[in-house]
Design a protein with these regions (language model features):
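Glycan-recognition and catalytic cores of secretory/periplasmic carbohydrate-active enzymes
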Residues: 1-179
Length: 179
């Protein structure tokens, strides 16, 4: 974009899938949500909400999953928020609300948020393969959607804390490294 172009954010709050190709694929949303939730709560699934529950003290286990596990959980919760926005079904919002305290408990005091690092003792930012920025990006989009659709600020505050932490880590790096 140049100085003469502008970009206005189009809130998904004004978008609804009612019929047609995608509209008809949303009719069984609770069945799909429950199926995905069951997978994310499976102790041996590569993406696990349970990792957040460990931080919250509600799950007695150790980290299990892939480097991108947190990101997959955020994408699921973001999808649920969009379904809630489209349907108004409080059962969908309750799914998201149940795991928000787990995410809050997983965030470190300095704002860092990544269970595969904090639960395993790995050094932060030591290997690009750890997908830390990938997971952060997915969290920020989930938190933004959550705030935009619900007006609730708990995830937005976590996102702000995480963004400030991330900025502090990378602010002194050369701009050429950004891509």
């Amino acid at each position: 974009m140049n100085e003469y172009q502008t970009f206005d954010f189009a809130s998904l709050r004004y978008s609804h899938l009612k019929n047609g190709f995608w509209g008809h694929r949303t009719e069984n949303y609770m069945e799909i949500i429950n199926s995905q939730l069951e997978a994310l709560l499976c102790p041996t699934n590569s993406a696990r909400l349970l990792n957040f529950g460990i931080h919250a003290g509600e799950v007695d286990d150790k980290f299990y999953g892939e480097y991108w596990s947190d990101g997959d959980c955020y994408k699921f919760l973001e999808a649920c928020i969009y379904v809630y926005q489209n349907t108004g079904d409080l059962a969908v919002k309750a799914v998201v609300d149940k795991y928000i305290p787990w995410i809050v408990a997983s965030q470190q005091e300095d704002g860092y948020l990544n269970t595969q690092i904090t639960l395993t003792g790995k050094e932060r930012w030591s290997k690009v393969i750890h997908h830390e920025l990938y997971n952060i990006g997915h969290f920020l989009t989930f938190a933004s959607a959550h705030y935009d659709i619900t007006g609730e600020t708990v995830m937005l505050e976590c996102a702000r804390k995480l963004a400030n932490y991330t900025y502090g880590v990378f602010k002194d790096y050369p701009r050429e490294l950004a891509h």
